[in-house]
């Protein structure tokens, strides 16, 4: 098999020293990246991390990562046997540079490279590694901001996203925000299209670039609709890969007095990494739905 290189750049709202510590302090690393860690911060020292949040490394005895290069607070490189095969190490190199634009406060430009001499022997290896780092970076951003972290669980045979929020408004107002195009455009959509019946069109009007291709992302169709109670839509592959099976997103509304409990369920995913950074994305949109509905309810 051919080699695989995955590169990424992330701007983080923290100084390089703070970000470096998040990777190299055991207590911090286990707060956002892995369940357990055993770190020897020297070249050639152990950089072990393991647990159900680490692919192919559920136990300490299966963790063989090592520090390759270390220069605080700007460089960390470590080996990472990711394929579960002896002798097939991948290598992660992270560089941290202070963002010269100080108008937004202390920030770090994190550049990463994950190199495999041979691509992992799995389906869609590039997508797998990309999603692995989308999960990690989303959790790192949340950790640095004091927000909620959503660690993956590689022991889960049926991975899914489940989020919930309580909105200070009755169900019919929340339901309106899910089915009215003008309302959707205020909190989640760009140019929403809604045919409010089963098998009707349902689009957020999203358009973005993935590896040089333009993708019309988000839902395309209503699968189920129950007035003021439930909305279920399809959710095609976000990278625009038509060969991948679509998932579905369910919005379930429950009346709790004068309030509404909204539960979002996104499923099914074929593998844990396919969940990607959806937990953070859906938490963001649920917060947007709450803010939109409560502000419009107050104004009316």
Where would I find each of the regions flagged by the language model?
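Beta-strand/loop substructures that line and gate deep hydrophobic ligand-binding cavities in soluble
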Residues: 5, 79-134, 221-224, 234-283
């Amino acid at each position: 098999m051919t080699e695989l290189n995955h590169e990424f750049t992330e701007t983080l709202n923290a100084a390089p020293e703070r970000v470096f510590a998040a990777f190299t302090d055991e207590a911090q690393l286990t707060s956002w990246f892995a369940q357990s860690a055993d770190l020897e911060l020297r070249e050639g020292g152990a950089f072990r991390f393991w647990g159900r949040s680490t692919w192919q490394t559920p136990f300490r005895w299966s963790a063989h990562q090592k520090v390759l290069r270390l220069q605080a607070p700007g460089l960390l490189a470590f080996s990472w046997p990711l394929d579960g095969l002896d002798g097939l190490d991948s290598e992660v190199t992270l560089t941290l540079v202070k963002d010269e634009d100080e108008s937004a406060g202390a920030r770090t430009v994190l550049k990463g490279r994950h190199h495999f001499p041979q691509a992992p022997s799995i389906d869609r290896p590039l997508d797998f590694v990309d999603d692995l780092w989308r999960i990690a970076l989303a959790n790192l951003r949340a950790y640095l901001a004091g927000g909620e972290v959503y660690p993956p669980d590689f022991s889960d045979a049926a991975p899914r996203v489940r989020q919930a929020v309580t909105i200070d408004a009755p169900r019919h107002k929340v339901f309106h925000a899910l089915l009215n195009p003008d309302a959707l455009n205020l909190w989640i959509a760009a140019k929403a299209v809604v045919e409010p019946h089963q098998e009707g069109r349902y689009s957020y009007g999203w358009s973005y670039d993935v590896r040089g291709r333009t993708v019309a992302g988000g839902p395309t169709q209503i699968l189920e609709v129950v007035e003021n109670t439930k909305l279920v839509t399809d959710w095609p592959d976000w990278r625009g890969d038509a060969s991948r099976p679509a998932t579905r997103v369910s919005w379930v509304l429950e009346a709790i007095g004068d309030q509404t409990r909204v539960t979002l369920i996104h499923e099914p995913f074929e593998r844990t990494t396919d969940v990607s950074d959806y937990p953070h994305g859906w938490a963001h949109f649920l917060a947007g739905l709450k803010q939109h509905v409560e502000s419009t309810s107050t104004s009316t």
